[in-house]
Amino acid sequence: MPGLPLLLLLLWGVGSHGFPAASETQEQDVEMVQKYLENYYNLKDDWRKIPKQRGNGLAVEKLKQMQEFFGLKVTGKPDAETLKMMKQPRCGVPDVAQFVLTPGNPRWEQTHLTYRIENYTPDLSRADVDNAIEKAFQLWSNVTPLTFTKVSKGQADIMISFVRGDHRDNSPFDGPEGQLAHAFQPGLGIGGDVHFDEDDRWTKDFRNYNLYRVAAHELGHSLGLSHSTDIGALMYPNYMFSGDVQLAQDDIDGIQAIYGPSQNPSQPVGPQTPKVCDSKLTFDAITTIRGEIMFFKDRFYMRANPYYSEVELNFISVFWPHLPNGLQAAYEVAHRDEILFFKGNKYWTVQGQNELPGYPKDIHSSFGFPRSVNHIDAAVSEEDTGKTYFFVANKYWRYDEYKRSMDAGYPKMIEYDFPGIGNKVDAVFKKDGFFYFFHGTRQYKFDPKTKRILTLQKANSWFNCRKN
């Protein structure tokens, strides 16, 4: 590839004392970085013709722009996290330079739009494709004055097709993985049209690529939306499947800024993505897992690793597709390398990213809770004793992980053995011999030997935030 050694020097920061032989993998990564920046960040494919110093700076600035968009550490170099992000399947619409057909911010002038499915993927039945597309349109019509009608022939406002490779729109697909689909802004001709890459496998569940999920995203472009930096938004460029497809509040705000709210008497409200450095952040559940700490909120996890300053935020379904959103408790049993998750009167068990078969199971038959207990507020297990503490309202139970039975004499009042933490526990975990209890925005570091609170901090103090 022309200019590849120069780009290797530029991006990997090799000094002027010599140029090491680039591995085949490294050359492939450089080629991928170059194509990614050309496709999604408007790095012109003739950038190497620019004078050296200016061209070098342009490539680095585009890489920094990409890192900033995805909330990565801005280095201007293709580090491991940047390469990982670039390799994720995504929408083919650029992040900073849209498929512009008309100047300004295009929108449909009429509120009654038509769509036509020109052909069907063999991966799904026609009925499944029709249903996925109809549901995707419904998401947007629920929050706007827009209505959508399917037509079977002729030209529609939004034409939908499954194509592969070069399909004569100046935006060829790249085969399996990579670009999944793309769509064009509102306008005449190709404006509003949606193309799905037939080289990808389309499904109606969590496997491969969920057609409903991708269609809902692409139709956002068809209506005039660009990509969002909010990882919880449907308009986030990378493919995410969280089990339930819904518009985040960020999506709703964006589309209503173009078309206004729906005419429904009650306006739909979407979920918001937690901000790790929000001083008002609270948690649904927390657990240790193989030396890391995972915090759960709604449909998201936040992952704190002692060796990294960055906090990873993503959908729970990325790790465990079958777990529900809104988990209420979680704990680690280190000697079995298991994590148990609780919601309502059900629980699930995983080992690493592997979801064990036979779940969910019932907490009453498995642990011996009385029928009056319909959910667990928080749970934590002690590795040295094999004892697990379950917190429910203002009481707690103690369970023996080796005997697989509840200890006698329980429940007890929380305030008796854990004085000062209050009568309600939202989440808890144990680290280095201390319990960390969470209630609302507060976190209590508790010494079980002295039964004293050692420190009181904000709940998100584990996230290296500058201000709390």
Curated annotation (Swiss-Prot):
Ca(2+) 1 binds at residues 123, 198. Ca(2+) 3 binds at residues 174-175, 177, 179, 197, 200. Zn(2+) 1 binds at residues 167, 169, 182, 195. Residues 1-18 form the signal peptide. The keyword Phosphoprotein applies. One of its GO terms (cellular component) is extracellular matrix. One of its GO terms (biological process) is cellular response to UV-A. InterPro entries: Hemopexin-like_dom, Hemopexin-like_dom_sf, Hemopexin-like_repeat, Hemopexin_CS, M10A_MMP, MetalloPept_cat_dom_sf, Pept_M10_metallopeptidase, Pept_M10A. It is found in: Secreted, Extracellular space, Extracellular matrix. Belongs to the peptidase M10A family. Its cofactor is Ca(2+); Zn(2+). It comes from Oryctolagus cuniculus (Rabbit). Tyrosine phosphorylated in platelets by PKDCC/VLK. This is Interstitial collagenase. Disulfide bonds join 277-465. Gene3D superfamilies: Collagenase (Catalytic Domain), Hemopexin-like domain. Binds 4 Ca(2+) ions per subunit. Binds 2 Zn(2+) ions per subunit.
